Swiss-Prot record:
Family listed: Belongs to the 4HPPD family.
Gene this protein is translated from: TFA
Main enzyme class: oxidoreductase
Protein name listed in UniProt: 4-hydroxyphenylpyruvate dioxygenase
Keywords: Dioxygenase, Iron, Metal-binding, Oxidoreductase, Phenylalanine catabolism, Repeat, Tyrosine catabolism
Record bears the keyword Nucleotide-binding: no
Lineage summary: Eukaryota, Sar, Alveolata, Ciliophora, Intramacronucleata
Domain of life: Eukaryota
UniProt pathway: Amino-acid degradation; L-phenylalanine degradation; acetoacetate and fumarate from L-phenylalanine: step 3/6
InterPro entries: 4OHPhenylPyrv_dOase, 4OHPhenylPyrv_dOase_C, 4OHPhenylPyrv_dOase_N, Glyas_Bleomycin-R_OHBP_Dase, Glyas_Fos-R_dOase_dom, VOC
One example GO MF annotation: 4-hydroxyphenylpyruvate dioxygenase activity
Length: 404
């Protein structure tokens, strides 16, 4: 259990629950696949702003006549893929164009690295998961990759990827990316250890069914949860459940809006994304201050946190003796980095502003110091900051309830 300065009490599971499920293990996140309007520009933006490097490519020059895909990754292996159709003649191109028209740029595939693709896929299908595509072996001179995919919430899919010691670039059919970003030679180096968690937003009253899907089809279990009695502001509130696999390599928080006086940032996402989808991606770092300062130098915009938050934080930390925050609080305040803690440790986190024109996808940078929570003590301060941005966009509107 965790109790922090705002007296928010949450529970999370520190150890695997029950017996190991049959079949192969989940090994972690393999990559995130975005469907976008211009894959080349999107990949370039992530190299210049977030410090990724060009990694792999598939397009006209490689014989791919229908879709172009640019893949970026960092030195630690965090991998993002961006795809754009060349036209609208084929079924897959029409699907991508319709997705773009409805949702804007967004995450289509949260791909999981797995030990046994066939086993995990077959079990999911037997338990009611809907097939996106069945198992197939992709091969080239560098080896083979086994993949299969199922639909999850909204139009998001999960691809199960078994790499079979594949030695090539990303996937069979890809080549080394021909571009190098010269800005990476002059801008600060950015280091992310891994994808910490990926958050999905659901419409009201859909969170539990989405969480249950992970438990039923993938043998995930509930790791952490909070409800609207804990997380609320004057205007809005949320509920959240975090689902994880047996080995806790993958963490998938599921959010939904709760009743409030005005439209919450969860509902704003649902409205502008036109349904459920990936709200934010959390990237783990060992040095959040250095990472954030480097990202700011590259032009990444972050939310602002009021001075009162840090005044209250200093008082709360002084009043307890369980943990010591090693970082300079003045530097954390200067960078608008949030702190949450329990009796065992603490975490540092910060959130970007939306990275699309639509107020949908954003990023979190997180540093964990023996703390496995998700910043429940910061949710209220975060919500207030998000509501200020909503108000600028004209979206912090009153909710009119239908009384009939």
């Amino acid at each position: 259990m965790s109790e922090n300065k705002d007296h928010v009490v949450v529970g999370y599971t520190e150890k695997p629950v029950g017996e190991r499920p049959t079949g192969g293990k989940f090994l972690g996140y393999d990559h995130l696949h975005f469907w976008v309007g211009n894959a080349k520009q999107a990949a370039g933006w992530y190299t210049s702003r977030f410090g990724f490097e060009y990694y792999a490519y598939k397009g006209l020059e490689t014989g791919s006549r229908e879709v172009a895909t640019h893949v970026v990754r960092n030195k630690q292996g965090v991998t993002l893929a961006f795809s754009t159709p060349y036209g609208n003649d084929k079924d897959n191109q029409r699907e991508m164009n319709q997705h773009q028209s409805l949702h804007g740029d967004g995450v289509k595939d949260v791909a999981f690295a797995v030990e046994d693709c066939h086993s995990i896929y077959n079990k999911a299908i037997q338990r009611g998961a809907k097939c996106a595509y069945p198992p197939q072996d992709l091969k080239d001179e560098h080896g083979s990759v086994t993949i299969a995919a199922v639909h999850t919430y909204g139009e998001v899919i999960h691809t199960f990827i078994q790499r079979n010691d594949y030695k090539g670039f990303f996937m069979p059919g890809f080549v080394a990316h021909p571009l190098k970003d010269p800005l990476n030679n002059v801008l600060p180096d950015i280091s992310y250890n891994y994808v910490d968690h990926i958050v999905g937003n659901q419409p009201d009253n859909m969170m539990t069914s989405a969480a249950d899907w992970y438990e039923k089809t993938l043998d995930f279990h509930r790791f952490w949860s909070v409800d609207d009695s804990m997380i609320h502001t004057e205007f809005s509130s949320l509920r959240s459940i975090v689902m994880t696999d047996y080995d806790q390599k993958i963490k998938m928080p599921i959010n939904e809006p709760a009743d409030g006086k005005r439209k919450s940032q969860i509902q704003e996402y649902i409205d502008f994304y036109a349904g459920p989808g990936v709200q934010h991606i959390a990237l783990n770092t060992s040095d959040v201050i250095n990472t954030v300062e480097g990202l700011r130098a590259r032009g990444v915009e972050f939310l602002s946190i009021p001075t009162s938050y840090y005044d209250n934080l200093r008082k709360a930390l002084t009043a307890q003796t369980s943990i010591t925050v090693k970082e300079d609080l003045d530097v954390l305040q200067k960078n608008h980095i949030l702190v949450d803690y329990d009796e065992k440790g603490y975490l540092l986190q910060i959130f970007t502003k939306p990275v699309e024109d639509r107020p949908t996808l954003f990023y979190e940078i997180i540093q964990r110091n023996n703390h496995q929570g998700f910043g429940a003590g910061n949710f209220k301060s975060l919500f207030v900051s998000l509501e200020l941005e909503q108000e600028k966009r004209g979206n912090l509107t009153e909710i009119v309830k239908n009384i009939y």
